[in-house]
Design a protein with these regions (language model features):
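Local sequence-structure signature of Cys/Sec-based thiol-disulfide redox active-site neighborhoods
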Residues: 1-24
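Small/polar loops that bind or transfer phosphate-bearing groups
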Residues: 6, 31, 59
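Accessory recognition modules or surfaces
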Residues: 8, 13, 39-42, 48, ...
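Thiol-based oxidoreductase modules, predominantly thioredoxin-like and allied folds used
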Residues: 27-37, 44
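A short, hydrophobic beta-strand/beta-hairpin element that forms part of a small beta-sheet core
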Residues: 48-56
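Non-catalytic, surface beta->alpha helical segment in thiol-disulfide oxidoreductase systems
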Residues: 55-77
Length: 77
């Protein structure tokens, strides 16, 4: 499973999404949209965006239970 978190510095929702991925034990790559003009234009108003296996699965506010279900992980695992 490939998981990518699109974020930017100073984004509190991005920090929350990152923490959820860590708590879920997910291996993920984080990409700073400010480092790429194309990503910046695409995701500026939508971050955080979590892409799982090529599908934009979550954006803006991430529900932790839904994220864990999509990743196949559960609280306490």
């Amino acid at each position: 499973m490939t998981v990518i978190l699109y974020s930017r510095p100073g984004c509190h929702l991005c920090e929350d999404a990152r923490a959820m991925l860590v708590r879920a034990g997910a291996a993920f790559e984080e990409r700073d949209i400010e480092a790429d003009d194309v990503l910046f234009r695409r995701y500026l108003e939508r971050i955080p965006v979590i892409v799982i296996d090529g599908e934009e699965t979550f954006e803006l506010v991430v529900d932790e239970a839904a994220l864990r279900a999509r990743l196949g992980t559960f609280a306490g695992s």
